[in-house]
Amino acid sequence: MKTWSHVALLACLSIKWLTCVMADSIYCDDPDMCSNSVDLDRKEFFPLGRHDGVYQTPEEDGDLEDRQTRGDPFLRFGRGDPFLRFGRGDPFLRFGRGDPFLRFGQSDPFLRFGRGDPFLRFGRGDPFLRFGKSDPFLRFGRSDPFLRFGRSDPFLRFGKSDPFLRFGKSDPFLRFGKSDPYLRFGRGDPFLRFGRSDPFFRFGKQQVATDDSGELDDEILSRVSDDDKNIRRKRSTDSAENAHTRHEREASAPRAKGKVGEVKSSDDFQSREIRSKPYMRFGRNNLNNYALEDEDCKLTSDIIDDQFQRYQRGPSRSSFPRYGKRQDKRHDYMRFGRTSGGDFMGYDKSPENVGAEQSR
């Protein structure tokens, strides 16, 4: 590094000395700006630096050096404890680390964003309307607030808890998830629920009825649902095979047709025994102890449970008019499709069936 010459250093010192001398001898046109009176501090209001920026006399607030070492101004940006300050301190409406009101950072303010216990704070604390991990009202995080989104027990909360109108895993009212709420969509036993349960006006499959008529948990419901799926897959496979060999069965003798129908219906009724009987249900219902070739009509009427406007499969003496074919000439109600024990109201063009239809 090249050093300065003695001439350059002497010139700098001379200029500095002349500047100080001339500054002391200059006549100022504005006495308010050049005097040591109180008005010198007016220009220090709202400053950006290390002084309070408050209009005070030197006697009231001390000298300038003492005030510069402190950091307590109003609306100051830096290090201190001001009001509406951005930095490190404990101000009001401050952004940084402190305990202010409406502060953004790590503290316990009101309407603060960070870590603390404020009101309407975003972060970790126990505020009102806070977003983070705490116990506020209308908070988003992990806590027990009202109208909170997270894991807790609030009202109208979205997460894992037991609130009212909650979306998640719990037992709330009007909840969407796995629980037992009212108007719930999922797995549970609610009212007006869409899923797998025992509700009123439910769309789905009923769970297996127990002896104590108790509610089943999600694990049991899952197993029941898997069994129902297997039954449906088996029935679909059987239907596909029957459709593939439909021409052969129609060309075969009526005796062979009766055997095929008997085997199919026996499997169908065994699968029905594990299903339930809801109200106004659309689908298939079980008929406990149902016999296909019952000659006694009273036995059939005693076995079948009385249901109101239920669309199901199986014969029912006390039911609404059904459209189909029956070998035992009993009435089924308003059912469109195939039934066990022979397809009724179908068009079987075998000679024996044509003669039977004409004799009727």
UniProtKB/Swiss-Prot annotation:
Record GO biological process: neuropeptide signaling pathway
Major location (coarse): secreted
Any one annotated GO CC term: extracellular region
Basic and acidic residues bias locations: 227-252, 259-272, 325-335
Entry-annotated residues carrying Phenylalanine amide: 77, 86, 95, 104, 113, 122, 131, 140, 149, 158, 167, 176, 185, 194, 203, 282, 336
Pfam families: FARP
Keyword annotations from UniProtKB, A to Z: Amidation, Cleavage on pair of basic residues, Neuropeptide, Repeat, Secreted, Signal
Localization per record: Secreted
Chain segments carrying region Disordered: 227-272, 312-360
Record-linked InterPro entries: FMRFamid-related_peptide-like (IPR002544), FMRFamide-related_np (IPR051041), Serralysin-like_metalloprot_C (IPR011049)
Proregion span(s): 36-43, 49-70, 106, 205-275, 284-317, 327-330, 338-360
Extent of the signal sequence: 1-35
Chain positions with Tyrosine amide modification: 323
Tissues in which the UniProt entry reports expression: Expressed in 57 cells including a cardiorespiratory cell and the visceral white interneuron (VWI).
PANTHER family noted in UniProt: FMRFAMIDE-RELATED PEPTIDES (PTHR20986:SF22)
Function: SDPFLRF-amide inhibits neurons. SKPYMRF-amide excites neurons.
Similarity annotation: Belongs to the FARP (FMRFamide related peptide) family.
Protein name (database record): FMRFamide-related neuropeptides
